[in-house]
Amino acid sequence: MFHIHHARLFAAAAALAASSFPAQAQTAAPAVPSATLPPTIVTAAPIAGSLTRPSDEQAAEEARRNPGNVTIVPASDFLERAGATSIRDMLLYTPGVFAEPKWGEDSRLSIRGSGIARNFHLRGVRLFQDGLSVNQADGSGDFQELDPLTFQRVEVLRGANAFALGANTLGGALNFITPTGRTAPGTILRGEGGSFGFARGQVAHGWAQGAHDAWASFSGMTQEGYRDHSAGRAYRLNGNTGWQWADNAETRIFIAYNNIWQQIPGAVTRSQALNNPRAANSANLAANAMRNLESTRLGTITAIRPEEGILVEAGAGFVSRELDHPVAFAPGFYQYIDQRTADISAFGRSTFDRQIFGRENRTIIGVNAAKGRNRSLRFFNNDGRPTTVMTANSIDRATNLDAYLENSLEVLPGFAFIAGASAGRSWRESDDGFLSNGDDSGKGDWGWVNPRFGVLWQAAEGAQVFGNLSWSTEPPTLFDLIPQAKDVQGFSKLDAQRSATLEIGTRGRRGDIAWEVAAYHSRLRDEIQCQTVGFSQCVALNLDRSIHQGIEAGADWVFLRDIGTKGDGLSFRPAYTFSDFRFDDDATFKNNELPGVPRHLFRAEMRYRHPSGAWFGPTTDWVPQAYYVDNANTQKTDSYVLFGLRAGWDFENGLSAFLEARNLADTRYIASASVAATATPNSALYEPGTGRSVFAGLQYRF
């Protein structure tokens, strides 16, 4: 699936990146001591950011300006792990995020209950890479294009706390930030291997000189997979180059290329998931189900500081995707999906930091625009190859426009009041070119005005209290609107999903303990739920009223120091998520629980670190209570507890070694599940979790 025009782009990008690098690599700067245990050296040392790329410290400072729960996840959280391939691996200890693997690098992602009934791919969370949209223009998306090896940090902006990115979704946004030649100078060579035929390698290089810098990474991965029919291969290029064309101005250009081949084992029944977890769904085997993707992303951001206290930013991105996707819509009804998509996006944002009557004041104003086109064809599928018999042909389009304004005023010393609003409109359209089974053409548009109010109190040194009341509107995606089930026709007439969320919480660091705790209560109208109506078939519907509420709590505590030698320490890192999602006096389902996510999710790691660079410790994942998979609350998953072990050694010469053993007891469990209106014991809704596995890796930075 390596097409000629993409091959030329790939070669040109590689040549451009190579031409930016001198023969001599720079040596990475020494690590800056942290407030807790000494950090690993698998990531670049903290270096000052630039106008287009704030440093990790600057990003953390921005997070502290937000009157809601925002987490900055440093790359060390996942780069010191061998075999970290998915969004789950990147956000494992981020409370409030439910991300569980399905197959390959795909995951089931939900933040505060977003998209819990989206059985395929993603809705309800906006994904950004370097501030530019990864989602398609209609808001849908997936995770295959995200390479954990190429990120410097992940910014987790839950719910309306992604306001300044223009994300009007219940789940908020995830912003994946790549390094630059200034933040990651030098060369990285990395290799990993492990269970189920897993092997991965990476070479990356960063360079900076004068007003110019460049960084690029190439990685390749192959795996056979834990389950039958779950093998995959992926090759990825990511890079950027920056030019400080004035003391107060900078432009950065980004490029990314992905070539991914992935088999899909499919969901199975509960009994099969717990008794024969490695087996694939028989229909997926017969259809030779796969998801093969080739994509190219180009983008640019320019930032100008015309005077102190004013920052003006503008950017644009383009993504081209080619998807070849053999699937099983029903036993004996096998389809081959052939899609070609093109999405463009643009944004403008201005930030004004000024004093009003001697009080600090910040105003942010911005606009976002996105437009996408998808040519979608379907054919009968013969063992993973398209036949000449067409079953669907459409041109689908999506457009979004929105603007936002937010102001934060320090009304009292250490106490700020925040007020803002966003307004926008979305358009969706599908032109059906295959009319022998009826005309499914249609179009719709949805508009919104959403206010937001918040408070932020610096209660003590290193401790903040925050709260906000925010509204959001989430238009349906094209996937929601276009018939996905075999016997369903017509462009759906869905309302936009609306919610109002009240959130309170606290965060901070005092001495050897850091924490983040938040509680939220959301009331939703017209929640969009994709209900399974048959084998691998989904129909999107609006619910009437529903409630999402929960608690997000995380900490990082160094509770012992100088145990056996000066400079060593023992730390404990727990993350707890409580999710209470339910119908609100529904005519059919009363006050039943909404299916799809566990009520309680607890993860923790204990780690001993020696000043020589050696570290090790146990890990645990605990879901103490099974959760429902259907609206009728008749069928459940199963509770489980998993134990693991991690270890590593960071040597002074730039070499790092790391090892991870997962699911040591080889527990059989259900990692995630699709949802249905009413399930039976024979419903194929369950994704088995991975059995016992071991991964190891080496990284050398010079």
Question: Model-derived features: where do they sit?
Answer:
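Structural signature of Gram-negative outer-membrane beta-barrels, strongest in the C-terminal barrel
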Residues: R354, R359-K371, S394-R523, R607, ...
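Membrane-embedded beta-barrel scaffold of Gram-negative outer-membrane proteins
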Residues: A303-R305, L311-V327, Q458, Q464-S470, ...
